[in-house]
């Protein structure tokens, strides 16, 4: 009779410790480091280890925010987004939510905050624009919203690589090329008179090589501020997040950035990544990097590697050396280090993005604009749905609702109006 693989018997002590850990999972330590080399002065960062509290006055509900803004055609949009985006996010989240509810509405609130920030900045009538990569860390849950090409990656404690942001460069995203051309704009390289096409793919009018950003009011309305949002949950082994501008990613692959910084504390790691990026060809662009380590509580900071490289060194970042029997047993029968995907949506349809999670939010804020949060009288708002009569399950509310100006913004984002310069 053929023998099957025997099931692994896990000691009772290990099982009991797992049960206790799952019931009382401690908050991680969040450590961050930043490095930047400036050429144009258009990169800005936001580093807030304690950005706010889900429950006012309760420090145990604090969350962290780390963001990178890579401006272009001036620094105005990047500075404005840095100053206003977090406040717009907090206004879009109802009060009185449990932690699970807060995390559930966070992706929708991020979309609203990005769109409001863009709408308000364009009212200033300045033509600069900016990428945004905005990271919210609540205990072991990481939520990333991004427009542009300031990429964000995660390396888990076992060395697995996860992409937490999208790349909205036309050269890298055929779906965005199709979306923009369907809206009536053209995508192509710079065409020199009498010569070949040169450079990256760009959107015309405007010549921007990104399909999503905040600002950029001088280009067609097909360049939108609706972010890609991804939410994941780390295991209690932790992980390392790297956020960097294209000054880094134009010269380093994700693996190269991880390799040159692995095993070092976050501040040293960020410096090593920036130096590695500018070493081959010198400083050609603003080059900025943020490194965030999410560590099991009370774990020692990593030491620089000597001869050892690779995943073993990275794993040492998250574990102290132990000699007691219980630790040896825990390591021998350790559960797999997994990163759980909770949410992932990069749709450009603002109505779809705002409707996600609305049933929960409508319990708290049924009559406010889903973008700017202005209070609406009953029957005053405009439903995001193209045909509200098809949505009887919303029991007459037919929400979410928008004010008149935000509804015009939605129509522009969804290509229901021609580009400004057409």
Curated annotation (Swiss-Prot):
Report the residue ranges that make up the PPM-type phosphatase domain in this protein: 45-294
Has UniProt tagged this entry with the keyword Metal-binding?
yes
Give the binding site residues for Mn(2+) 2: 70, 246, 285
- Per its UniProt record, what Gene3D superfamilies does this chain match? PPM-type phosphatase domain
Q: Which InterPro entries match?
A: PP2C, PPM-type-like_dom_sf, PPM-type_phosphatase-like_dom
Cofactors that this protein relies on: Mg(2+); Mn(2+)
Pfam families reported for this sequence: PP2C (PF00481)
Tell me one GO biological process term: regulation of intracellular signal transduction
Q: EC number(s) for this protein?
A: 3.1.3.16
Q: What is this protein called?
A: Probable protein phosphatase 2C 69
**Mind giving the lineage of the organism this protein is from?**
Eukaryota, Viridiplantae, Streptophyta, Embryophyta, Tracheophyta
